[in-house]
Amino acid sequence: MQLEKNPKTRNLYRRLLRLGDRVTGASFPKMKRVKQITVFHCGPAVIEALFSFLGVRVSQTGVVKSLRAFKKIKRIGLSVKDLARATHALGHGKYVFWKKANSKISDIETIITKYKFPVGVEWQGVFYEFEDEDNGHYCIVTKVDREGGFLRLSDPFHAFSGIDRKLGIKFFTQRWWDTNLVKGRILKDRRMLFVVVPQGQNWPKKLGMVKAN
């Protein structure tokens, strides 16, 4: 974590992570590591990446266009509900957006290891010298290592995209929340996770997830 935090050692640290991935194999190699096109587009970038894992091409602009949210995304960003609506529209009803609040790390681990899907999360991102007043962020968890006490995150933010980040599980869990402005009310999402799966796959229901399309 300290190596990533320090701008002087960050590039070396990222090269070491990349080397490790080449040796052991990166998780979900079929999934595109997407860079968000603006500071507002972390949600659309995550949807683009999750669809890429399924072999479906969508764009971040297409996500925003499907919601007619060009002004909204710059003002308050996109909610999980918005991402679900975009998934339904761009997937033409062939894919389902499942979500679960108040999740556990074990839920993420089960989805990755048993069901073999990457997991979207809504959390308080860590940007270091790029920090701004709103740290609400979307990323994709690609690996959970209980023994090592860390997880790997595909982060679309420009400084971290391309190589999955490595964060301590405890550190991530403390930041696994976000707030959203919905109809004038501020609502807090706690430990929100989500996946995009083909229509007809109902295993997310076994984990207490709900369809959000």
Where do the model's predicted regions map?
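Active-site-adjacent structural segments surrounding the nucleophilic cysteine of cysteine proteases
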Residues: 1-77, 146-147, 199, 203-213
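Active-site-adjacent substructure of cysteine-protease-like catalytic cores
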Residues: 101-158
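Mid-length scaffold segments of soluble, non-membrane domains
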Residues: 78, 87-100
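Stable alpha-helical elements in mature extracytoplasmic
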Residues: 43-46, 79-86, 104-108
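Structured segments of extracytoplasmic/periplasmic soluble domains
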Residues: 49-53, 57, 86-90, 111-114
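Noncatalytic regulatory segments and standalone regulatory/sensor domains
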Residues: 2-9, 71, 132-133, 144-213
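Short aromatic/hydrophobic-glycine micro-motifs
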Residues: 56, 92-93, 117, 209
